Curated annotation (Swiss-Prot):
Its EC number is 2.3.1.31. Its main location: cytoplasm. This is Homoserine O-acetyltransferase. GO terms for molecular function: homoserine O-acetyltransferase activity. It comes from Cyclobacterium marinum (strain ATCC 25205 / DSM 745 / LMG 13164 / NCIMB 1802). Keywords: Acyltransferase, Amino-acid biosynthesis, Cytoplasm, Methionine biosynthesis, Transferase. Homodimer. Belongs to the AB hydrolase superfamily. MetX family. Substrate binds at R212, D329. GO terms for cellular component: cytoplasm. It catalyses: L-homoserine + acetyl-CoA = O-acetyl-L-homoserine + CoA.
Length: 351
């Protein structure tokens, strides 16, 4: 980590933040201690006002170069030669942070199914402890898509004037029944795996393959599959789309964990920034920072109407839209449009 240095450093470093303080959860439960895996790149400027905090989606990690390579990195929009870039793996995720396979400090054994249900607000609270640990009094920009956008919006509420800009991409202020329904069907797929319920790291792996295949149908748009998975010859079986979905399921199951998927999908379901704050419109109206809400015209999971709703109810809101055939996943694909939108926003709102 290179908070301040007389030499320009853009090499990314990965570290573990060990928090010995208890983290109280919305459920009333708590973690007596926890850890977050995080990366930093670049350095703080003299005014300490160049912090960009990147928030990953459901199965992401703390290395945004791998999943947002068109936006973050040398000579990209968020260039570490100009910004101090932070990205932390969420609480509950399986890339180095406290998660269901971590040992419970109360008994020294893995949590497994005793891992507490967490919310997007809990995830934001854990991130804020890391912010304090890093000595960051203010953040220039929090940016995230999907689950990352939900966490970003929660964090924007609690950060108040410590945050200058929140960029919320393909996300919402409250989880819709549609999203919860998709997540529930995926958890049902995991439950149907005969290994689910067993105290072993690989439990639910085959079910996770199916869950991911279901998820892929919501991350894209029918036009995506029509363009990329249509057959060029007459067939009665062995369709491209079938092998594609099986491949995507296997690919995720080999790099992720079913228990983390379960926990984070539940966190996504829990998202409601108005809970305990007088309702969603009131919570949005209390956000102090400038908010850029970006929707995708073909997103069937987090609809563009939900993104537009955010911008209408925050005091300093801007709405922009990505046009794409790729549905929800457009925020990870349409870099040219994203860069244009971001450039316009910063020019208009940040001098």
């Amino acid at each position: 980590m290179n908070l301040q240095s007389p030499h320009l450093t853009i090499e990314m470093t990965q570290e573990i933040f060990y928090c010995q303080e208890a983290l109280s959860l919305e459920s009333g439960e708590s973690f007596p201690e926890f850890q977050l895996s995080f990366t930093t790149q670049g350095q703080l400027n003299a005014n300490k006002d160049n912090v960009i905090w990147v928030l990953h989606a459901l199965t992401g990690d703390a290395n945004p170069h791998e999943w947002w390579s068109g936006l973050i990195g040398e000579d990209k929009f968020f260039d570490p030669s100009k910004y101090f870039i932070v990205c932390a793996n969420f609480l509950g995720s399986c890339y180095g942070s406290t998660q269901p396979l971590s040992n419970n400090p109360n008994n020294g054994k893995p949590y497994y199914y005793d891992f507490p249900n967490i919310t997007t607000r809990d995830i934001a609270s854990a991130l804020d402890k890391l912010r304090i640990h890093l000595g960051l009094e203010k953040i220039n920009t929090v940016i995230g898509g999907s689950l990352g956008g939900q966490v970003g919006l929660e964090w924007a509420v609690s950060l108040g004037e410590k945050l200058e800009n929140a960029i919320i991409v393909a996300s919402n202020a409250k989880a819709s029944p549609w999203i919860i329904g998709f997540n529930e069907t995926q958890r049902m797929a995991i439950e149907s795996d005969s290994t689910w319920g067993k105290t072993q790291p690989e439990a639910g792996k085959k079910g996770l393959e199916t869950a991911r295949a279901i998820g892929m149908l919501s991350y894209r748009h029918p036009m995506t599959f029509l363009q990329n998975q249509s057959e060029t010859e007459e067939k009665r079986d062995d369709f491209k789309i079938s092998s594609y979905l099986r491949y995507q399921g296997l690919k995720l199951a080999n790099r992720f964990n079913a228990m983390s998927y379960w926990i984070l999908s539940k966190a996504m379901d829990s998202h409601d920034i108005g809970r305990g704050r007088g309702g969603t419109p009131v919570a949005l109206s209390n956000i102090k920072c400038k908010v850029l809400s970006i929707g995708v015209d073909t997103d069937i999971l987090f609809t563009s109407e939900e993104s537009r709703y955010i911008s209408k109810h925050v005091p300093k809101g801007t709405y922009r839209e990505i046009s794409s055939i790729y549905g929800h996943d457009a925020f990870l694909i349409e870099y040219e449009q994203l860069q244009y939108i971001l450039k316009s926003f910063y020019l208009e709102n940040n001098g």
